[in-house]
Curated annotation (Swiss-Prot):
This is Undecaprenyl-diphosphatase. The keyword Hydrolase applies. Catalyzes the dephosphorylation of undecaprenyl diphosphate (UPP). Confers resistance to bacitracin. The lineage of its organism: Bacteria, Pseudomonadati, Pseudomonadota, Gammaproteobacteria, Enterobacterales. It is a multi-pass membrane protein.
Amino acid sequence: MADMHEWVIAFILGGVEGLTEFLPVSSTGHMILVGSLLGFTDDKAKTFEVIIQLGSILAVVVVFWRRLFGLIGIHFGQVPHEGIGSGRLRLGHILLGMIPAVVLGLVFHEQIKAIFAPIYVMYALVVGGVLLLAGEWLKPKVPRAAGIDDLTYLQAFLIGCFQCLALWPGFSRSGATISGGLLVGVSRYAASEFSFILAVPMMLGATVLDLYKSLPFLSWQDLPMFAIGFVTAFVVALLAIKFFLQIIKRISFVPFAIYRFILAVVVYWILIG
């Protein structure tokens, strides 16, 4: 029965991770809240979260595999051009998008760990929601980058600067990068695509490091639970990414901002108040 209980927890948390990791709603906020409600907050829980993040990352790789391989010079046919100009998304765009957060993350690693608490997550949810609204309301009327291949190196770097906000637990990496993309003149769809592609090296590096640190807590007995969480996160993230890229063509990010405000109230009510 104990195993079945853990498998149910793995299925629920894997679903939460897969659904929220790439939406601008903060996967951290959801994982803290749901993990607390399920009573799953020990060292095993931290290791479990690292494992299921790999499932979410794999989903992005599956969706964008042709473009991702193309960025490193491995081509499987022609990648469709997305944009109105003659440019192409290059590896340089990804590197420029990574540099700011990597540097700040290394310099302020200990300080970031110190603010990993519900109260700071609540504040991050609110501020991130405000940034989403700002991105929608202050963005240029006509995007300067209609498609991801129109992205300039400067825009990629500026989006990377916005990504630094995601070092604040609960802010949402996708929320920060998508909002930043809107503000620097990238269309909703292109900003979302770039956010997903940028997530692969950023999340993979951080996850592998966390996994190495979690090795003492890994046990063969936990393999079924971790496998269930991994597969669930992968499948749900795959569906969430495809669904999100479709609906974002028709709706704004305002509903996501409102949802963040509601979630902040729930976090305060359940975990703080």
